[in-house]
Design a protein with these regions (language model features):
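Short, basic, glycine/proline-bearing loop/turn elements
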Residues: 44, 68-79
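Active-site beta-strand-loop-beta-strand hairpin of nuclease catalytic cores
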Residues: 52-69
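Domain-level recognition of nuclease-like catalytic cores that cleave nucleotide substrates
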Residues: 103-105, 109-173, 178-180, 187, ...
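Short, charged, amphipathic alpha-helix that recurs within catalytic cores of restriction-modification
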Residues: 75-114
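Long, low-complexity, intrinsically disordered segments
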Residues: 196-206
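Structural alpha-beta junctions
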Residues: 18-22, 95-104, 128-130
Length: 206
């Protein structure tokens, strides 16, 4: 059954019209418009070989400007507490994210929900740089229990249609990778180089 939902997400992110339209059938008009943005900026979505290999996630999502592994979870309850194998998967995603500078994601599908039934979460890592570092600020990380252990709460995730809007919009009103790079450059301290005349005057007065 889980492979069915993996395929559902894969069709949406890959910009496959037939599969995508079936998924968004019960979405609102606004949600459908955001979901369809991926048709113009689709991803190559590959099911990880031997899905479930430590740290690879279930899907590898690639495009010229971005790449991330996604672990797919499907439940009827809105919360999923990680333990045993699922906790091992999470720890492996953290390890590979730190080691490779990746931004691993969880995609959680809640059964029995109309509209956008997917929620996106980020696995917290400390090695993100550049555009991914800025993008990560927009995506909620997995919430934590009182003991500090990560878990999944569908209610606290980012709707898939909003995630697609962030990574697929092409104008400066949304942080696509090019726009994110511009923000990075803007946020960096600006160092003003003195003009030749200013430098000569400084040396003369010294």
């Amino acid at each position: 059954m889980s492979s069915q939902y993996e395929r559902e997400l894969r069709h949406v992110l890959a910009g496959i019209p037939a599969g995508g339209e079936a998924v968004i059938r019960s979405c609102s008009v606004e949600e459908k418009e955001r979901m369809r943005m991926v048709l113009k900026r689709p991803f190559l979505v590959v099911r990880a070989a031997g899905s479930g290999i430590e740290g690879s996630g279930d899907l590898l999502v690639l495009r010229g400007d971005i790449c991330f592994p996604i672990e797919v979870k499907t439940t009827r309850p809105s919360k999923l507490y990680l333990s045993g194998r699922t906790l091992d998967q999470y720890n492996a995603l953290v390890y590979e994210g730190e080691r490779c500078g990746l931004m691993p994601l969880y995609a959680h599908r809640l059964k029995g929900v109309r509209g956008d039934s997917w929620r996106i979460f980020r696995v917290e890592t400390t090695t993100l740089t550049g555009s991914l570092g800025v993008l990560a600020r927009r995506i909620p990380s997995l919430p934590r229990t009182r003991n500090g252990r990560a878990f999944i709460d569908w209610e606290q995730g980012m709707p898939l249609n909003e995630f697609i809007e962030i990574v697929c919009q092409q104008d400066a009103s949304s942080p696509t990778l090019g726009f994110l790079q511009g923000r990075i450059e803007f946020e960096q301290p600006q160092v003003t180089k003195p003009s030749v005349i200013e430098e000569l005057l400084r040396r003369r007065s010294a």
